[in-house]
């Protein structure tokens, strides 16, 4: 399932169909947030059922918001700048997602650090896609 969702994102050219790109990044981030929430609730059990539901929602919706902001920012910056395959678009998207995380946590330090780290990570992923880097090589049979 994961390769299908990632393929859905990468098959859309940058700077086009921003709503579909935002949907893809939101769904990917939501699954990541739900996974983090499952670990959080399992390893640090809440006092009541409602506290657990609140924590799961908090993690999931925060991740979904970060994913949506990332997808929209990368697509809109590619469209506005008219440079669809530029890693700077992904840096801007990662930075915007990091700032969203900082706003959610009400912490400037987290927002600034997440802006830099998410931006660098996203631009490295884009550079890797453009240059054909293989992180996990396919086995040669």
Swiss-Prot record:
It comes from the Eukaryota. One of its GO terms (biological process) is mitochondrial electron transport, NADH to ubiquinone. Keywords: Acetylation, Electron transport, Membrane, Mitochondrion, Mitochondrion inner membrane, Primary mitochondrial disease, Respiratory chain, Transmembrane, Transmembrane helix, Transport. The keyword DNA-binding does not apply. The modification N-acetylalanine is found at residue 2. GO terms for cellular component: mitochondrial inner membrane; mitochondrion; respiratory chain complex I. It is a multi-pass membrane protein. It is found in: Mitochondrion inner membrane. The chain crosses the membrane at residues 21-43, 58-80. Its main location: mitochondrion. InterPro entries: NDUFA11 (IPR039205). Belongs to the complex I NDUFA11 subunit family. Accessory subunit of the mitochondrial membrane respiratory chain NADH dehydrogenase (Complex I), that is believed not to be involved in catalysis. Complex I functions in the transfer of electrons from NADH to the respiratory chain. The immediate electron acceptor for the enzyme is believed to be ubiquinone. It is linked to Mitochondrial complex I deficiency, nuclear type 14: A form of mitochondrial complex I deficiency, the most common biochemical signature of mitochondrial disorders, a group of highly heterogeneous conditions characterized by defective oxidative phosphorylation, which collectively affects 1 in 5-10000 live births. Clinical disorders have variable severity, ranging from lethal neonatal disease to adult-onset neurodegenerative disorders. Complex I is composed of 45 different subunits. This is NADH dehydrogenase [ubiquinone] 1 alpha subcomplex subunit 11. It comes from Homo sapiens. The gene is NDUFA11.
């Amino acid at each position: 399932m994961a390769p299908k969702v990632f393929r859905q994102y990468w098959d859309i050219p940058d700077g086009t169909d921003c709503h579909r790109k935002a949907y893809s990044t939101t769904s990917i981030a939501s699954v990541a947030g739900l996974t983090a929430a499952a670990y959080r609730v399992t390893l640090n059990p809440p006092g009541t059922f409602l506290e657990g539901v609140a924590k799961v929602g908090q993690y999931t919706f925060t991740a979904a918001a970060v994913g949506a902001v990332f997808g929209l920012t990368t697509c809109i910056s590619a469209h506005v700048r008219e440079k669809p395959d530029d890693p700077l678009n992904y840096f801007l998207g990662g930075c915007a997602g990091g700032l969203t995380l900082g706003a959610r946590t009400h912490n400037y330090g987290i927002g600034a650090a997440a802006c830099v780290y998410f931006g660098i990570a996203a631009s490295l992923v884009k550079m890797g896609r453009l240059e054909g880097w293989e992180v996990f090589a396919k086995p040669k049979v």
